[in-house]
Amino acid sequence: MSNESNDLEKNISHLDPTGVDNAYIPPEQPETKHSRFNIDRDTLRNHFIAAVGEFCGTFMFLWCAYVICNVANHDVALTTEPEGSHPGQLIMIALGFGFSVMFSIWCFWWGFEPSRFSLFVFGQSHLSSQMCSDVVSSDHCWDGCWWCR
């Protein structure tokens, strides 16, 4: 009889005197694909925007350099040279890569970070944070800057 009463007490221990069930039952939360890593939609969207910006900037830089290399390597005047590279070709390729970087920097407001630019365009970053990060990340300042003295 004592075993039966102990089992009964264990079974009704979570009931209050009126017989209402007060046991805490945690709500079932569906396990989503990204809930384990605490990644929400905005985070994924921001990463996607940054990835697209990086792709566009890198593609623009490499495409411009590729075009210059093809022009330098297919120059009709330099086809009579023996095997090897002509110094004019090397200079043109070097200038092509330099102008490619310059063009990419010019397109992205003198700061070669397409991901920051794309975050700004889509409203995920403010202009003040863009300007502050440009000043902090720059290698040089204007003449008379108190920081560079």
Curated annotation (Swiss-Prot):
Presence of the UniProt keyword Cell membrane in the record: yes
Induction: During exponential phase in rich medium and repressed in minimum medium, hyper-osmolar medium or in sporulating conditions.
Membrane topology reported for the UniProt record: Multi-pass membrane protein
Full protein name: Aquaporin-like protein 2
Originating gene: AQY2-2
Extracellular side: 69-89
Domain comment (free text): Aquaporins contain two tandem repeats each containing three membrane-spanning domains and a pore-forming loop with the signature motif Asn-Pro-Ala (NPA).
Keyword terms, alphabetized: Cell membrane, Endoplasmic reticulum, Membrane, Repeat, Transmembrane, Transmembrane helix, Transport
Lineage of origin: Eukaryota, Fungi, Dikarya, Ascomycota, Saccharomycotina
A Gene Ontology term for the protein's cellular component: plasma membrane
